[in-house]
């Protein structure tokens, strides 16, 4: 079984992925997008086997694609635990980046020690529109850091995100994605024809806007 399918299998087993057929009960993302599917990767931290599998897969992905990495950065809040586990596996320093600066104390947006010119890989739990991840990358770049790329547990493979990452010249890799999810759910007979078409049409609708 591929890494993608292994991750998807684990996410389904812990019920991190939920599909709702009834349009009136669809999920609402932070961006305002209505979605028949929700991927709650925060649940992975409660399952040692799953989080270890994710950490090892991240390490392999980073070793393969970002050989010059010097620091692992987690996105607040969902990327923080995974960044901690990966940085420990790779024996690398770690930082995490808030959505905005604190309003008290040192008012830091980046927590942890990082120096200008450092090569950083950002760890994110989920990529939808890509907006929050790109904001983190911009923050790091503003502090003189070299962002090698972003790795995520799951990506919806939305065109709006692909375009945004391309415009920012940011490389993105994910351990699993929407297309692989649909394929795997069909393989294990978790989707009927109507559900399969619903998921395809929803994503196509977003990509064609």
UniProtKB/Swiss-Prot annotation:
Q: Which Gene3D superfamilies does the entry link to? A: 3.40.50.2020
Family annotation (InterPro entries): OPRT, Or_phspho_trans_dom, PRibTrfase_dom, PRTase-like
Query: What CDD domains does the record point to?
Result: PRTases_typeI
Binding residues for 5-phospho-alpha-D-ribose 1-diphosphate: 98, 102, 104, 124-132
Q: Which reaction does it catalyse?
A: orotidine 5'-phosphate + diphosphate = orotate + 5-phospho-alpha-D-ribose 1-diphosphate
Task: Output the Gene Ontology terms for molecular function.
Answer: magnesium ion binding; orotate phosphoribosyltransferase activity
Instruction: Identify the keywords attached in UniProt to this record, alphabetized.
Output: Glycosyltransferase, Magnesium, Pyrimidine biosynthesis, Transferase
Q: In which pathway does it act?
A: Pyrimidine metabolism; UMP biosynthesis via de novo pathway; UMP from orotate: step 1/2
Cofactors (names): Mg(2+)
Q: EC class of this enzyme? A: transferase
- Give its E.C. classification number: 2.4.2.10
Q: Name one GO biological process term.
A: pyrimidine nucleobase biosynthetic process
Which NCBIfam families does the entry mention?
pyrE (TIGR00336)
PANTHER family xrefs: OROTATE PHOSPHORIBOSYLTRANSFERASE, URIDINE 5'-MONOPHOSPHATE SYNTHASE
Homology family: Belongs to the purine/pyrimidine phosphoribosyltransferase family. PyrE subfamily.
Q: What does this protein do?
A: Catalyzes the transfer of a ribosyl phosphate group from 5-phosphoribose 1-diphosphate to orotate, leading to the formation of orotidine monophosphate (OMP).
Subunit details:
Homodimer.
Mind telling me what this protein is named? Orotate phosphoribosyltransferase
Which species is this record about? Answer: Malacoplasma penetrans (strain HF-2) (Mycoplasma penetrans)
Name of the encoding gene: pyrE
């Amino acid at each position: 079984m591929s890494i993608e399918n292994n991750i998807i299998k684990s996410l389904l087993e812990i019920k991190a992925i939920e599909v709702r057929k009834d349009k009136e009960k669809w999920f609402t993302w932070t961006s305002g997008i209505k979605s028949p599917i929700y991927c709650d990767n925060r649940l992975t931290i409660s399952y040692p086997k799953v989080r270890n599998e994710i950490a090892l897969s991240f390490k392999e992905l980073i070793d393969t694609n970002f050989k010059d990495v010097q620091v692992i950065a987690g996105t607040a809040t969902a990327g923080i635990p995974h960044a901690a586990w990966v940085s420990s596996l790779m024996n690398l320093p770690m930082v995490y980046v808030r959505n905005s600066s604190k309003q008290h104390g040192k008012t830091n947006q980046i927590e942890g020690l990082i120096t200008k010119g450092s090569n950083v890989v950002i760890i994110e739990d989920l990529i939808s529109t890509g907006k929050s991840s790109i904001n983190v990358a911009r923050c790091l770049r503003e502090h003189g850091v070299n962002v090698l790329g972003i790795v995520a547990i799951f990506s919806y493979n939305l065109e709006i995100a692909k375009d945004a990452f391309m415009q920012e010249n940011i490389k993105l890799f994910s351990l699993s994605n929407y297309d692989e999810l649909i394929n795997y759910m069909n393989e294990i007979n978790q989707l009927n024809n109507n559900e399969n078409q619903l998921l395809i049409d929803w994503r196509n609708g977003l990509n064609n806007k």
